[in-house]
Amino acid sequence: MGRDTVAEIITSIRNADMDKKRVVRITSTNITENIVKILLREGFIENARKHRENNKYFLVLTLRHRRNRKGPHRNIFNLKRISRPGLRIYANSQRIPRILGGMGIVIFSTSRGIMTDREARLEGIGGEILCYIW
C-alpha cells in the first residue's frame, strides 16, 4: 500500500488543532512543502521550518490559535481531503468550486504545480482538487 502524503498532512494538522497543540511535525516531501507554502501565504499557519533528523527531513509547523482564554476552544480552520488515491476528483477551469463564497481556499494540483483556486482561475487552468480549507 502506498502512502497518501496529502491525507497525512491534513490529518496531522487537524488533530493538532483539535488537541490545542501549537506545533506539528510532518514528513517533508515536495507536495507537502508546496501545500505548507500555500498555508503560510494564506495565513492559516504562523511559521514553518525544515528540520533534519537521522537523514530524514521534517517540516515543523507552528499553528495559529486564538489567544483568548475564556470560552470554548474554537478550531481556527477546517481541512477536508477531496481527491484521494481510490477516487480522483478533477475540475476544469470553468468548474473550479468556491468555498464559503470565496472565504475558503481550494488547493489544486495542476500541470503548473500546486496552487490555490484563485491562482488557477487567473491562469485559466484546472486540475486535481487536493483539499478544501476554510
Swiss-Prot record:
InterPro entries: Ribosomal_uS8, Ribosomal_uS8_sf
Transcription found in the keyword field: no
GO biological process, one term: translation
Superkingdom of this protein's organism: Eukaryota
Region forming the signal peptide: none
Example of a GO cellular component annotation carried by this entry: ribonucleoprotein complex
Annotated localization: Plastid, Chloroplast
Keywords in alphabetical order: Chloroplast, Plastid, Ribonucleoprotein, Ribosomal protein, RNA-binding, rRNA-binding
A Pfam short name: Ribosomal_S8
Primary location recorded for the protein, binned into one broad class: plastid
Transferase is among the record's keywords: no
Stated role: One of the primary rRNA binding proteins, it binds directly to 16S rRNA central domain where it helps coordinate assembly of the platform of the 30S subunit.
Entry similarity comment: Belongs to the universal ribosomal protein uS8 family.
NCBIfam families linked: PRK00136.1
PANTHER family: 40S RIBOSOMAL PROTEIN S15A
Entry protein name: Small ribosomal subunit protein uS8c
